[in-house]
Amino acid sequence: MAKKKSTISPLYVHDKPKSTISEKFRGIRSNIMFSNAENEIKSLLITSEKSASGKSILSANIAVTYAQAGYKTLIIDGDMRKPTQHYIFDLPNNSGLSNLIINKTTYSDSIKETRVENLNVLTAGPTPPNPSELIASSKFATIFNELLNHYDFIVIDTPPINTVTDAQVYARIVKNCVLVIDAEKNNKSEVKKAKGLLTKAGGKVLGAVLNKMPIDKNSSYYYYYGED
């Protein structure tokens, strides 16, 4: 099993389902579901403008909310540079997305069950020397489309978009995006840059989540829509 990082927050929605923050996560899920009235959203890219914004914890908890709602859900750790989901779910990471793209493993060996019903995790796998090139390959597009046919909903946790190009490459395929912003430490120009990069790549920014927002003492997540 994965050695846990002491800084990793719990799966609030699963472990503390009646907490205020769990309700906030469910509210975010509802906003995502109703953000596109014409077409059902089946996949979601979650990124941030910088590191340490809380995107991985958000990704995990959003995935749990979909699983709890009865959706057969998969969370993909798309951050092959600094993977986190295997720590959050306490899973091995010897086999995952990176191996799958280069045909060194199978779906059954890479996709792991979790303690959450209806939720599987595709961990990042060993860090490759060329993450962006692997993501841009036709093999990844094939993998993603095959997984869409197998799951009701897919969440992809990606690296910060202003740091490396990985999230832009994912956005070309996944399309629907949510940007996580640190409410305490952010730069308006960097946030605009992040949104611009997602849009330029072909992504549709559904909205943003302000993390560390002091709404009340029990909650730190707030979802909003907006063009600016």
Curated annotation (Swiss-Prot):
One annotated GO biological process: capsule polysaccharide biosynthetic process
Gene: capB
Residue runs in coiled coils: none
Cellular compartments per GO CC: plasma membrane
Keyword Transferase: yes
Homology family: Belongs to the CpsD/CapB family.
CDD domains tied to this protein: BY-kinase
Catalysis performed (reactions): L-tyrosyl-[protein] + ATP = O-phospho-L-tyrosyl-[protein] + ADP + H(+)
Role: Required for the biosynthesis of type 1 capsular polysaccharide.
InterPro entries according to UniProt: AAA_dom (IPR025669), Bact_polysacc_biosynth/exp (IPR050445), P-loop_NTPase (IPR027417), Wzc-like_C (IPR005702)
Protein name: Putative tyrosine-protein kinase CapB
Pfam families named among the record's database cross-references: AAA_31 (PF13614)
Keyword Membrane part of the UniProt annotation: no
Enzyme class: transferase
Taxonomic placement: Bacteria, Bacillati, Bacillota, Bacilli, Bacillales
EC number, as in UniProt: 2.7.10.2
Pathways per UniProt: Capsule biogenesis; capsule polysaccharide biosynthesis
SUPFAM superfamilies in the cross-refs: P-loop containing nucleoside triphosphate hydrolases
NCBIfam families hit by this protein: eps_fam
Keywords associated with the record: ATP-binding, Capsule biogenesis/degradation, Exopolysaccharide synthesis, Kinase, Nucleotide-binding, Transferase, Tyrosine-protein kinase
UniProt GO MF annotations: ATP binding; non-membrane spanning protein tyrosine kinase activity
